[in-house]
Amino acid sequence: MNTIVGTYECKVDSKGRLMMPNPLKKQLNVSLQEGFVLKRSVFQQCLELYPMKEWDLMMQKINKLNRFVKKNNDFIRRFTAGVRIIEIDATGRLLIPKDLAVFASVTKDIVLSSAVNIIEIWDKDLYEKAIDDSVGDFADLAEEVMGNVNDDEYGIS
C-alpha cells in the first residue's frame, strides 16, 4: 500500500473536469497508467478516488463476504452503486461524472484530500465544514481510535 500525502485545492471546469495537482500526480505516477475507481463515500458527502491496485485490494475483501447473506448483498450493492473507472487524460485532467458530482455537491471549488491510500474529493465548503465541525472532538476521537494501539514496530505506543 502506498501512502498518499497532502491536501490540495482545485477548480472544476464547466464540464466537470479537474486538473490533477503536480505533487499528487508525482505520488500517483504508477497509478496513472493503471487507472482509478471513483465512488461515493460511505460516511461523508464526498467522493473517493481509489488507485486501481487499492480498489482491487478492497474488492478482494468484499469478495470474501457470503453472498447468501442478504445484508452482505445489500452492502455490496450500495457500496458499489455509481462506481466508475476513471482515467487521467494526457493533459492531467480527471472527469467527474455528473451523477457523482451531484452526490458530492461538486461544482467549482474543490479539495483533494489524502486519506491514507485513497483521495477524497470534496466540495470546498463541505470539506471546511467537516473539518471545522470535528475540531473539538478530534482529541477524543484520536484517543478512542489510536489510544489502544500498541505497535512499537511503527513507533506507535
UniProtKB/Swiss-Prot annotation:
Keywords: Cytoplasm, DNA-binding, Repeat, Transcription, Transcription regulation. InterPro entries: MraZ (IPR003444), MraZ_C (IPR035644), MraZ_dom (IPR020603), MraZ_N (IPR035642), MraZ_sf (IPR038619), SpoVT-AbrB_dom (IPR007159), SpoVT-AbrB_sf (IPR037914). Residues 7-54, 83-126 form the SpoVT-AbrB domain. It is found in: Cytoplasm, Nucleoid. One of its GO terms (cellular component) is cytoplasm. Its main location: cytoplasm. GO terms for molecular function: DNA-binding transcription factor activity; transcription cis-regulatory region binding. One of its GO terms (biological process) is negative regulation of DNA-templated transcription initiation. NCBIfam families: division/cell wall cluster transcriptional repressor MraZ. Forms oligomers. Belongs to the MraZ family. HAMAP family: MraZ (MF_01008). This is Transcriptional regulator MraZ. It comes from Flavobacterium psychrophilum (strain ATCC 49511 / DSM 21280 / CIP 103535 / JIP02/86).
